[in-house]
Amino acid sequence: MWPQPHLPTHPHLPTHPHLPTHPHLPTHPMMSKETRQSKLAEAKEQLTDHHPQTNPSVGTAASDTKKKKINNGTNPETTTSGGCHSPEDEQKASHQHQEALRRELEAQVHTIRILTCQKTELQMALYYSQHAVKQLEGEARDLISRLHDSWKFAGELEQALSAVATQKKKADRYIEELTKERDALSLELYRNTITDEELKEKNAKLQEKLQLVESEKSEIQLNVKELKRKLERAKLLLPQQQLQAEADHLGKELQSVSAKLQAQVEENELWNRLNQQQEEKMWRQEEKIQEREEKIQEQEEKIREQEEKMRRQEEMMWEKEEKMRRQEEMMWEKEEKIRELEEKMHEQEKIREQEEKRQEEEKIREQEKRQEQEAKMWRQEEKIREQEEKIREQEKKMWRQEEKIHEQEKIREEEKRQEQEEMWRQEEKIREQEEIWRQKEKMHEQEEKIRKQEEKVWRQEEKMHDQEEKIREQEEKVWRQEEKIREQEEKMWRQEEKIREQEEMWREEEKMHEQEKIWEEEKRQEQEDKMWRQEEKIREQEEKVWRQEEKIREQEEKRQEQEEKMWKQEEKIREQEEKIREQEKIREQEEKIREQEEMMQEQEEKMGEQEEKMQEQEKMRRQEEKIREQEEKIREQKEKIREQEEKIWEQEEKIREQEEMMQEQEEKMGEQEEKMWEQEEEMQEQEEKMRRQEEKIREQEKKIREQEEKIREQEEMMQEQEEKMGEQEGKMCEQEAKMQEQEEKMRRQEEKIREQEKKIREQEEKIREQEEMMQEQEEKMWEQEEKMCEQEEKMQEQEEKMRRQEEKMREQEVRLRQQEEKMQEH
């Protein structure tokens, strides 16, 4: 056994605490040859020193032993030669044996060199692979920390989405409450308009009566003057007693008239006070309405600010999602690199296993060769006993070397154990990587959950659309109720016409009775004074009602404007959601749809203008039936427009389905464009129909003017009839019995007037209830403002959290950049 040379460590490889120190090859291959030649020369010198020619004692001893062995027949080589063996043959045999040993040593040294070179290469590869694995471990830790941050951020985003959803629900509830209040106010306004119209008609009738009473007053004054003249004449003719009686009678009549006048004055003062109080209440209501409008404007501004904040947050969310996607892409790339390194590690492990197998085979071969050499050595022991001492010394050296080799083998076994431990560590790292893979799968599952939440949001939006359709159905019900109320108004008009006919009959009868009975006329004058007072009260009430109606109309207009703003805001929100979910390829379709929406808005504006015209025409009392027909046509048009809107909604749903099937969408685009053209043609036809309706309305206005001219002609005929009634003074005696019946009718009218006063009181109570409702609404507005403040505080807290998250993301980006720079440096 020959000693193995000491292999120094490689100078270029850095020492690592985890890597074991192994023996390496020398830096230059010529050093091994020189050492080998020097050792061979020393062995030759030792052999020459121990040769039998130089040392006779050794030779004799050797010859004696050889002879004994030859005689015993133990050596097969010397038995054939007949007991003679020359020293030259021994030298040749020893020389051949040394050459064979040299060849074996050279082969072993060559294999050792190859193995050491392979070992150094493997150690280098192992070092670089371990270094790369450590870098990947650091990157994996960074990625895990980022994943945790991203999970936290996703949770915060979910909380923000839930908060936004709650805010949206609150806004929807507030909108529903406003719509309910608007409907209630519209009904009250409609009732007030009906009562106003009734009061106007009554005022017109009372004005006509006033005119008649004034004419009667003028006639009575003339009669009084004539009576005074007659009295003056009678004073001259009649005695003083009769004059005193008549004067007393006239004085009593004057006192009664003065008392009636004072009562009328007091009543007028009371009515004036009531009017002032009602005006003050109306002013207060107007101030409250203005304050509410200001609050509503402030709330709208706050809502706009919140919408802007929401838009900004959505933009930040999109940016962060893009960053998360980029980070995921980086994670995928790093995972691919890790996989490549794992494959390389597997290849290196296979190479190591192959090398170990080769080493084991070489060891087996070496053992077999050693066994053969030992057999040869045993055969040559008899011949080379002289060299036994040297060989023993060499064997001692070899034993020492073998001990060193055993120690080296132990070291190798320890190194193998360490390598196995490292392999275990690598397996643990692989397990950690598998856990990272599982975490990524969890992230994908969370993304799927987020997508499901988005689908839920879409479903909620569809529910909102269904609610809007329900609101439209409620509006249709309100329209039907209005039609019923209009039918009731028609019935009231018919009753009022009957009352007018009765009043005309009254006028004719009054003219007949005025000429016959002056005293009865005075009683009637008292009744007429009462009627005048009542008429003044009614006028004051009508003025108050008119003012209330004007204020209510202004409130309705403002509410309509607010509703339009809310609708516009909802449309903006819908457009934003559509823009977020639609892709770049559908932008052209969105532009077309927006153009259609603009056309629809223009048509709606035109319809609004037409509705205003219709409202102006509704004031014409005698054309309500024709206007109703027009309103029915307009409703049909609105229903058509709603159907078109539903078609547009259906088209939008089709567009969403087309996002998944883009190939089918390209084929259906042509069909959709054709449908759009057909819809535009239908819109043009509708515009033509609207123009025709306007022409019909103008024709109706002409007819109304003709009817007014006819009414004037009828009034002239009535005046002629009144002149003819003067000729019928002789027939008034027969109508005295009818006067009693008419007095009963007057009493009934007084009862009706009292009932009207009760109704007016009920209206005042309703106005008070409205004021209470307004106060409750103000309290609700205050509560809503407080909630809005709380929401703003929450939004500020969320913004602070978002800023902190942005700072964390920036720090992570800086770390990533530093890591990338380090990777580039390596």
Curated annotation (Swiss-Prot):
Q: Where is this region: Disordered?
A: 1-100, 297-327, 345-425, 502-534, 547-646, 658-826
> Does the keyword section mention Electron transport?
no
Q: Where is the composition biased (Polar residues)?
A: 53-63, 71-83
Q: Which domain of life is it from?
A: Eukaryota
Keyword Zinc applies: no
Give me the stretches of Basic and acidic residues compositional bias. Answer: 31-52, 86-100, 658-678, 686-826
What are the record keywords, sorted? Answer: Coiled coil
**Coiled coil: which residue ranges?**
157-822
Q: Which family does it belong to?
A: Belongs to the GOLGA6 family.
Q: Which PANTHER family match?
A: GOLGIN SUBFAMILY A MEMBER 6-LIKE PROTEIN 1-RELATED (PTHR23143:SF31), TRICHOHYALIN-RELATED (PTHR23143)
- Please report the name of this protein according to its UniProt entry: Golgin subfamily A member 6-like protein 25
What gene is it encoded by? GOLGA6L25
